[in-house]
């Protein structure tokens, strides 16, 4: 079944319209966020009110250190139900697919950040898989807890392959791990698979175990990184944050300290994580952490434990299903670190730069929140 | 209940029980040897077996006046409290409701037990309560002798600050009342909890429940109502917004004002925000 | 959008502060029409800037005077006709360059314009005074080349020279002219509608269909988030900017935005005015002023008061009747990359649309009652032509344009939030 959002159909109609007028320009449909560097500089896009194009970062005279080497995009936390039950989340993921497909130039790949399904149902995973097939760039999949705990990952692995894998790309070592392993809390309680899934699906019930990478996962990571030079930039994709933010909501990785220890020897490590559905920034030692936005709904900030580097996104407006949601891109820089572009729907985009994180908030601070959640 | 009569009661109990115990094993019976006074003054021992107080100006074998006895008891109690700071002695302190989020229970003093004599009005609570108690007793027309209010086994408990007011109207509730009331309230809040977390119970048609955007009722800020609610362009109360959320993000039918579910949700949300100061109109 | 928030913060601050900061001299606040709240007046008219009768009368004359234009052919009233709801009932305004060249924007009404946080569809003018200055100098609206030309012309008219001398004790400047026009505009408050009487307690002021429409307005129609109405803030507008997808099907937003970032000089009001009125970049709306991607294609929420008599609708006048407007919203607007996330299909039936239009018709002030009836009859006559209607999209049979709630069954579906009861 061909998955085309209504927006895509309109893009096609407009394409035809302009072709008819002899004014066709493929480049016209691109979101401004994707304007390529040279073009931006050539046009002198430095007007004070223009939104922060990621590329403007290189206006600074730093010998090109902050120049992006390449970019990848992400779509995360889609939480799909079957469409006839809930069309809203489908509409949202299609919007994200349109966003990434409209980028010019196209990103090197698109990361899916986990929680493709809401309750791990076969219909949900199949729906998600079919939608993601329409993404033009290659897609890298990462598993979330909503995908796993109905059948303990059977269908996920059948569709999308192993949960732990790594690859090298343009001098950067990428690792995807599963960080939503949970110690068995269901057998003693005599839970059915659906009950287990529903327990995991609730953020605040406190019944499920805390997330962890687990011993096997950590061993896999150790072995994988053993072959990597310490100067090679490492980017880790993880669903849970790989640090300890707020335990009651499982914004938490229990063995975070151990995982961070495995990553410590490397000069430049960036962790891109999902699960938290909010703009989230942290730095622990040599590791920079960037959270991804969800397409489905935003989480409020936790009452405590918020990393001090995080500049909160504005509180979401419940009238607007897209507010507080979105997708994004990550520019991997020459120096091995990464700038995270948050493409917040219905808001101006926000870039959280590696320089901001590295300077512990001293420079390049993202715009402050007007209205925090509380 | 005054300290002296309370003390007397406890002492009597100790003797009664201790006597029985003693009867079983006279050989191991503990014996509180009060230190003798150098001047031959009366030395009174406390039931803890170690504390004692010397009464100046009263010789061994003499009777103490009421006020002297009260003063001696006070002194002994103070000494005992100093030695036992962790002791869970139920004294007649003022009732106050916990301000901070200190778990679930309302903090309570032990209210006067049943059968307390009505009309007893001894001030209690805070520093100088004992003074106040004596003052109040003094101003009474006849009635009980100074410092005495109820009596017997069912008399009012006495603490350092004095006895607790009693009565049959709401303000003189008992611990049993507190327990029942708390259970009832928590039951209601628990119902709200269930509904808050269930798209079906909310009447939602798209599988979205409140906790998806508001885990533990975060970001509901009920303490800011009434306020101008942008989503409807006018001032709103919490329940207006609950209904609006049910209609919009949750895609259910808004609940009528007298619907149990609406009230239960309100209860749950308010309960999660315990201790947060009220700040109406805050955005 | 960020430009608006300081104003909103000020507004909110003032509303909160109002119980404590009231006008010492009550005579300075004129008698307000029913439905216009004191808060709205005090927030919009700074103390000391209340119009005096002399100034307003002078402004009235200037407003209607064609000599202000370069060819003596166009006055403010040409596009903002006081007899016709202060609009011209044309889709796009036509000035001195008509018929060869029309402007690119629809004329907004002056009625209640004093209560807007900013003026123009894109909010490029911060006040009525600043707004009045721009069309006079726009090449295709009133065509004057420089402010000095205007001032010279006005000074030559003895009536004006005398009036300004009396008013200010000196010869008029361009600011004075704008100030007088603004003073006149500040007398054009319009409340006193059947809806206002209904809110004030008269159950019979509007009919059952309009009452159902009012309920839908607050519920299924999803109108109040932008077209906010409360007794303290009765403007039916949040004064923010939203992209609702008007003309999106023929607009290349991204291409236009890329051009605009290079062409438009931020802060240059005159240039932005010309770009907005004369060029195809007009469709960018608020983006021309802020250059923020969130503002691409976003236009200010207009008031709905007197909406029946201020057609055609939208920034480009592309909606001839209120039924067309309802069709546009019913299908969820026209999708485009910057469509406001609040836009979605509504699933309204024809009967519900009729009810909502009936409600909107009750927002016409009494002094225009007859004209309102006439306009509604005319629009109703065009009901069969419905180019915007897309029932399949509205009902969800095609596209992913939003989910609907089940129809509410409350006793009073409009009873959400607080409408202050009438003062007894």
Predicted regions mapped to residue ranges:
Chain C
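Periplasmic c-type cytochrome electron-transfer domains
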Residues: 2-7, 20-424
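Bacterial N-terminal signal peptides
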Residues: 9-19
């Amino acid at each position: 079944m061909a998955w085309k959002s209504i927006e895509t159909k309109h893009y096609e109609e407009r394409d035809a319209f302009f072709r008819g007028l002899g004014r066709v320009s493929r480049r016209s449909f691109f979101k401004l966020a994707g304007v390529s560097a040279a073009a931006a500089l050539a046009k002198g896009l430095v007007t004070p009110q223009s939104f922060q194009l990621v590329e403007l970062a290189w206006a600074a005279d730093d010998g090109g250190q902050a120049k992006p080497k390449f970019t990848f995009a992400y779509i995360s936390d889609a939480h799909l139900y079957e469409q006839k039950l809930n069309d809203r989340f489908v509409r949202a993921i299609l919007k994200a697919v349109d966003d990434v497909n409209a980028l010019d130039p196209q990103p090197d790949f698109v990361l899916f950040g986990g929680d493709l399904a809401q309750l791990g149902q076969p219909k949900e995973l199949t729906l998600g898989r079919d939608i993601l097939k329409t993404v033009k760039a290659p897609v890298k999949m990462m598993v979330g807890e909503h995908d796993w705990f109905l059948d303990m990952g059977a269908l996920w692995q059948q569709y999308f392959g192993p949960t732990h894998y790594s690859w090298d790309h343009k001098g950067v070592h990428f690792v995807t791990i599963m960080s939503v392993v949970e110690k068995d809390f269901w057998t003693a309680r005599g839970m059915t698979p659906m009950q287990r899934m529903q327990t995991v699906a609730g953020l605040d019930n406190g019944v499920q175990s805390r997330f962890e990478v687990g011993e096997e996962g950590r061993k896999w990571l150790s072995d994988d990184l053993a072959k990597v030079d310490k100067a090679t930039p490492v980017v880790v994709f993880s669903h849970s944050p790989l640090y300890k933010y707020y335990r009651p909501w499982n914004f938490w990785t229990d063995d975070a300290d151990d995982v961070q220890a495995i990553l410590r020897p490397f000069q430049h490590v960036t962790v891109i994580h999902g699960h938290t559905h909010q703009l989230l920034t942290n730095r622990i030692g040599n590791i920079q952490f960037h959270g991804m936005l969800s397409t489905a709904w935003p989480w409020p900030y936790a009452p405590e434990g918020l990393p001090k580097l995080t500049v909160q996104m504005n509180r979401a407006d419940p009238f607007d299903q897209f507010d507080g949601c979105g997708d994004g891109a990550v520019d991997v820089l020459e120096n091995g670190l990464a700038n995270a572009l948050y493409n917040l729907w219905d808001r101006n985009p926000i870039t959280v730069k590696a320089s901001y994180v590295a300077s512990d908030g001293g420079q390049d601070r993202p715009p402050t929140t007007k209205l925090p959640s509380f | 209940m005054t300290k002296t009569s309370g003390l007397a009661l406890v002492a009597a109990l100790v003797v009664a029980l201790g006597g029985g115990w003693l009867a079983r094993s006279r050989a191991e019976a503990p014996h509180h040897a009060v230190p003798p006074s150098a001047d031959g003054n009366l030395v009174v021992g406390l039931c803890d077996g170690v504390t004692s107080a010397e009464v100046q100006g009263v010789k061994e074998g003499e009777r103490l006046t009421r006020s002297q006895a009260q003063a001696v008891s006070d002194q002994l109690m103070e000494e005992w409290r100093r030695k036992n700071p962790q002791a869970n002695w139920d004294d007649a302190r003022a009732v106050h409701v916990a301000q901070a989020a200190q778990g679930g229970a309302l903090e309570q003093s032990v209210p006067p037990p049943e059968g307390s004599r009505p009309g007893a009005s001894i001030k209690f609570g805070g520093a100088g309560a004992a003074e106040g108690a004596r003052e109040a007793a003094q101003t009474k027309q006849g009635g009980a002798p100074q410092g005495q209010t109820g009596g017997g086994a069912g008399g009012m408990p006495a603490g350092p600050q004095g006895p607790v007011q009693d009565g049959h109207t709401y303000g003189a509730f008992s611990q049993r009342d507190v327990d029942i009331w708390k259970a009832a309230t928590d039951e209601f809040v628990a119902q709200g909890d269930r509904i808050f977390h269930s798209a079906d119970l909310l009447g939602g048609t798209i599988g979205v429940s409140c906790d998806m955007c508001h885990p533990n009722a975060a970001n509901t800020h009920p303490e800011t109502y009434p306020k101008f609610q942008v989503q409807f362009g006018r001032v709103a109360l919490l329940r207006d917004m609950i209904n609006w959320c049910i209609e919009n993000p949750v895609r259910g039918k808004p609940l009528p004002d007298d619907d149990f579910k609406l009230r239960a949700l309100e209860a749950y949300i308010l309960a999660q925000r315990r201790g947060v100061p009220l700040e109406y109109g805050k955005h | 959008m960020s430009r608006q928030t300081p104003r909103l913060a000020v507004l909110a601050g003032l509303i909160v502060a109002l119980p404590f900061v009231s006008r010492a001299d009550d005579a300075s606040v004129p008698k307000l029409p029913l439905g216009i709240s004191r808060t709205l007046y005090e927030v919009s008219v700074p103390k000391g800037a209340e119009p005096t009768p002399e100034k307003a009368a002078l402004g009235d004359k200037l407003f209607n005077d064609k000599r202000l234009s370069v060819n003596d052919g166009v006055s403010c009233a040409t596009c903002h006709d006081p007899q016709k709801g202060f609009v011209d009932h044309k889709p796009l305004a036509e000035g001195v360059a008509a018929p060869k060249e029309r402007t690119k924007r629809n004329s907004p009404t002056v009625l209640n314009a004093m209560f807007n946080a900013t003026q123009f569809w894109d909010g490029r003018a911060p006040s009525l005074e600043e707004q009045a200055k721009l069309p006079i100098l726009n090449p295709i609206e009133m065509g004057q080349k420089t402010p000095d030309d205007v001032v010279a012309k006005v000074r030559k008219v003895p009536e004006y020279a005398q009036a300004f001398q009396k008013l200010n004790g000196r010869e008029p400047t361009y600011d004075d002219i704008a100030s007088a026009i603004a003073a006149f505009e500040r007398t054009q408050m319009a409340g006193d509608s059947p809806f206002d009487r209904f809110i004030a307690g008269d159950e019979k002021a509007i009919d059952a269909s309009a009452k159902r429409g009012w309920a839908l307005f607050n519920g299924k129609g999803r109108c109040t988030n932008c077209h906010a109405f409360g007794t303290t803030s009765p403007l039916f507008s949040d004064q923010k900017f939203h992209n609702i997808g008007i003309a999106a099907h023929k607009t290349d937003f991204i291409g236009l935005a890329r051009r605009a970032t290079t062409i438009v000089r931020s802060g240059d009001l005159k240039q932005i005015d010309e770009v907005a009125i004369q060029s195809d970049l007009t469709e960018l709306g608020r983006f021309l002023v802020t250059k923020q991607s969130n503002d691409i294609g976003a236009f200010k929420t207009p008031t709905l008061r007197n909406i029946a008599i201020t057609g055609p609708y939208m920034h480009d006048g592309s909606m001839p009747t209120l039924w067309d407007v309802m069709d546009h919203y019913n299908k969820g607007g026209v999708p485009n990359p910057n469509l406001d996330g609040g836009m979605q299909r509504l699933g309204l039936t024809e009967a519900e649309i009729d009810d909502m239009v009936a409600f909107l018709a009750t927002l016409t002030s009494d002094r225009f009652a007859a004209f309102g009836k006439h306009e509604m009859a005319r629009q109703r006559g065009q009901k069969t032509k419905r180019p915007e209607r897309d029932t399949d999209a509205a009902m969800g049979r095609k596209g992913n344009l939003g989910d609907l709630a089940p129809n509410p069954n409350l006793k009073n579906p409009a009873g959400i939030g607080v409408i202050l009861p009438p003062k007894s």
